[in-house]
Design a protein with these regions (language model features):
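Glycine/Thr-rich phosphate-binding loops of Rossmann-like dinucleotide-binding domains
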Residues: 67, 120, 183-184
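Glycine-rich phosphate/diphosphate-binding loop of Rossmann-like nucleotide-binding domains
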Residues: 6-19, 100-177
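A short, aliphatic-rich alpha-helical micro-motif
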Residues: 51, 71, 167-169, 205
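Phosphate/diphosphate ligand-binding glycine-rich loop within oxidoreductases
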Residues: 1-99
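Short beta-strands and strand-loop turn motifs
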Residues: 28-32, 79-81, 107, 136-138, ...
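Rossmann-fold NAD(P)-binding glycine/threonine-rich loop
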Residues: 196-206
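Glycine/threonine-rich flexible loop motifs
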Residues: 178-198
Length: 206
């Protein structure tokens, strides 16, 4: 499997390389500096070439379209290791951890507080598909993407509120994420103000 990292990560790289080794496979690390795609080669050409050498690709990148284009033009499985839109592998790991703790997922209430970012989006989709109750608390200006809210609309198991304390009522699992993701460093001060109170602390968990 080829591991393409447009965005660096300690845990994503180590977990995929370790997992492939433990399963008897091999992982080939590829940064943007190692690929012609980083120097203007069309993604369709990269997808076709890598499909001749690899059995699969995991890509951690910025734009969701890059993942979709690799899948469109390549002939091997493409794994989304992270994009600005979603973070499915992380949420699969989170759901596995929750199931290890409780033995089930169905019927549990999972709460997320903070930015309506890629983590929030994947938790909404993953949680609802697993028949969990999903409660999200985020400021109005940082809500999850409209297409995801449309996906969740009409599902009684989903709630979206502004108040973190209300969101965590009777929750079995409480999750949060960084207020400032990679590439948003210039917004750090604004985000610190916007997300005051959107953190897991003693007051919230009391």
């Amino acid at each position: 499997i080829g591991l393409i990292f447009q965005k660096s990560s300690t845990r994503t790289r180590v977990s995929f390389e370790t997992g492939m080794f433990q399963l008897g496979g091999q992982a080939l690390f590829l940064s943007s500096r190692d690929l012609q795609i980083g120097r203007g080669e069309p993604v369709q050409d990269t997808a076709r070439v890598l499909s001749r050498y690899l059995d699969g690709i995991m890509i951690r990148t910025y734009e969701q379209k890059e993942v979709e284009d690799l899948a469109k033009y390549g002939s091997i499985p493409i794994i989304n290791g992270l994009t600005d839109f979603c973070h499915p592998c992380q949420v699969l790991a989170d759901l596995m951890t929750i199931r290890e703790k409780y033995g089930v997922l169905k019927g549990l209430k999972m709460c997320y507080i903070g930015d309506g970012n890629n983590m929030a989006i994947s938790l909404i989709v993953g949680g609802l598909k697993s028949d969990m109750q999903v409660s999200i608390a985020t400021p109005d200006n940082y809500r999850p993407a409209k297409e995801v809210l449309d996906f969740a609309a009409g599902n009684d198991a989903f709630t979206l509120v502004n108040d973190p304390i209300k969101a965590v009522e009777n929750a079995d699992v409480v999750i949060t994420d960084t207020w400032t993701s990679m590439g948003q460093e210039e917004e750090k001060k604004i985000r610190q103000q916007a997300f005051q109170g959107y953190q897991i602390n003693d007051e919230l968990m009391a």
